[in-house]
Amino acid sequence: MIASLDELYHSELFFLPVMDENARLVGLEIIATFAAEDGAVRMPTELVAPRLSVEEQYCLFVEKLALLETCQHFFIQHKLIAWLNLPPAISDLLLLDSELFSRAARFPFLELAINENYPGLNQGKNNETLANLAMHFPLMLANFGAGEASTKAIFDGLFKRVMLDKNFIQQRAEMISFEPFMHAIVAQISSSCESLMIAGIDTEAMFARAAPLGFSAFQGGLWPPVPVSQLIKLVQR
């Protein structure tokens, strides 16, 4: 996809691994970076996304679905989950556009990731769009703890999985209360979702601290993103 910012950028897609407590692959999040045409500048999606038009967000979402289609047998064979971030601007389109809906719904292993800044998230199941999405697709709250939402949508059972925000984790990790605080979150949230995951695991030391705390999966710089050509290496370790 080509994005028109201060100059032209093209999207490049990668797979960000999610591991279990034994460092075995359980799923992959499809993420995008944006590179300038000359390749000199690269930017992550979170910096570019606020500047993308609805049409560009739609194209990026479709591009991710197309990539997923090319490697769906890999996900099925290895019983892996795929996560795609769903921008708020695409939520209604996904429910209203039958072709787009069918393209997403055809993957039984696909789950949609929602961020805390999703409009009306604090309404929980009273948010009609969010409730309808949860009826048709497994949802993951991708950055719980970012400080932009309450726990209502979680306790309303809208999310199959909850991922703790990487910045929240890295800030808390510096405190001596990290372990008991994480135990408290696990105790509070676990009964409201199928899986509680943690991001921000950038080192072996951090993985060793987080692994015994009751989380089902882990994501971070310890397992960097890979292009589609290197997917098979993730299951050969």
Curated annotation (Swiss-Prot):
Q: What is its quaternary makeup?
A: Interacts with FlhD in the FlhC(2)FlhD(4) heterohexamer, inhibiting its ability to activate transcription.
Q: Which residues form the EAL domain?
A: 1-237
SUPFAM superfamilies given in the database record: EAL domain-like
Q: What else is known?
A: The multicellular rdar morphotype is characterized by the expression of the adhesive extracellular matrix components cellulose and curli fimbriae.
Is-annotated flag, keyword Transport? no
Known PANTHER family for this protein? ANTI-FLHC(2)FLHD(4) FACTOR YDIV-RELATED, CYCLIC DI-GMP PHOSPHODIESTERASE PDEF
Asked if the record carries the keyword Manganese, the reply is: no
Q: What are the BP-aspect GO terms?
A: regulation of single-species biofilm formation
The name of this protein is Anti-FlhC(2)FlhD(4) factor YdiV
GO-annotated cellular components? plasma membrane
What would you give as a GO molecular function for this chain, any one? cyclic-guanylate-specific phosphodiesterase activity
Sorted UniProt keywords: Repressor, Transcription, Transcription regulation, Virulence
State the deletion phenotype: Decreased bacterial resistance to hydrogen peroxide and accelerated bacterial killing of macrophages. increased levels of c-di-GMP. Down-regulation of rdar morphology, 50% reduction in CsgD expression, cellulose and curli fimbriae, increased swimming and swarming. Decrease in c-di-GMP levels. Derepresses transcription of flagellar class II operons in nutrient-poor medium.
Q: What does this protein do?
A: Acts as an anti-FlhC(2)FlhD(4) factor by binding to FlhD, decreasing its ability to bind DNA, and thus negatively regulates expression of flagellar class II operons, decreasing motility in nutrient-poor medium. Required for resistance to host phagocyte oxidase. Suppresses killing of macrophages, while promoting resistance to hydrogen peroxide. Data regarding c-di-GMP is controversial; suppresses bacterial c-di-GMP levels but neither synthesizes nor degrades c-di-GMP.
Tell me, using the record's free text, what induces this protein: Induced in nutrient-poor medium (at protein level).
Classification via Gene3D superfamilies: EAL domain
Name the protein family. Answer: Belongs to the YdiV family.
